[in-house]
Amino acid sequence: MRKIIHIDMDAFYASVEQHDHPELRGLPIAVGGAESRGVVCAASYEARRFGVRSAMPGAKARKLCPQLIFVPVNFDRYREVSRAIHAIFHDYTDIIEPISLDEAFLDVTENKVGEPMAVEIAREIRRRIREELGLTASAGVSYNKFLAKIASDARKPDGLCTIHPSQALDFIAELPVEAFWGVGRATAERMHLLGIRTGADLRERSLEQLTRHFGKAGRVFYDFARGVDERPVIYEWVRKSLGCERTFGENSAEPLVVEAHLREVVEELDGRLQRRQFSGRTLTLRVKFADFSVLSRSASFSEAFSSPELLLQRGLELLRGLDYADRPIRLLGLSLSHPPEELRPGMWVQQWLPFAEDEE
């Protein structure tokens, strides 16, 4: 049986700022969003108590929390700390799947320290992050990625939770459907209309019922409700492309808000590219709208690139080529593919992918 750990840093950007600036500790702070039409990148737990959230317009955040302190974004610093965190991970395993600068899965089934108990590795990683970096992390331990993620969410912030195989079905049964991967606001509403509100309700539905109502995602929900998730922890270095996505807190068709989200995606993607030392010639933008339709646009270039400046410039060009004024966006994704050795000469001409429908 596999042993999977999910590590999720607590309010990462805001916590780094509070660590580096002791005068901010214990105060409600927002990273980014100070400009008149800016958007909050991250909020400290003190600010979250007032309802301040990431991707929220700064003006709204200030109304919710008049004493909110805005600090500028410092992605170079966040990447530096993220690299230090990953260096700690690598002391225990090289089977690491980064999700973002502040989140990762680790497969410690076979590990470098010969520790049979995954929970002890998770406990040691959390201790080292606290002592060496002055930050806190939440960790979930289980036998697959779905349950490890659920476990880390259950004890945030600064917690450790283990879900053993014998506990999995009871744990899942009590989960609200909103806690399941792939269940956003609209899907949750559809589930509620069908009388599905918890993992137990979901488990009562047949595979045929779930796929009829939710398409391909129905199979995933069926498996998750039974504690089944066979997805491996994916090494970054075996991938032919690297990308990341961000789901909005609120759907938006406001260009400033959408482009602020794209900048955040670029920053996360840049961190992954740097760790992998990966470059590519094809950039793909993926947009999911409020009605769950999906549109992809791709452009290929003669030279491989990976700089955040070019990622942002070319990503914005793809985004600004779309007409979404009447189509609020709920998710943006950006990926870089075709490393230098994989794209044949002469394939540099810009290419556009057609509109495509997709399941949530």
Predicted regions and their residues:
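Gly/Gly-Pro- and Ser/Thr-rich, intrinsically disordered tail segments characteristic of DNA damage-repair
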Residues: 1-213, 219, 336, 340-344, ...
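DNA-contacting surface of Y-family translesion DNA polymerases
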Residues: 6, 179, 187-331, 338-359
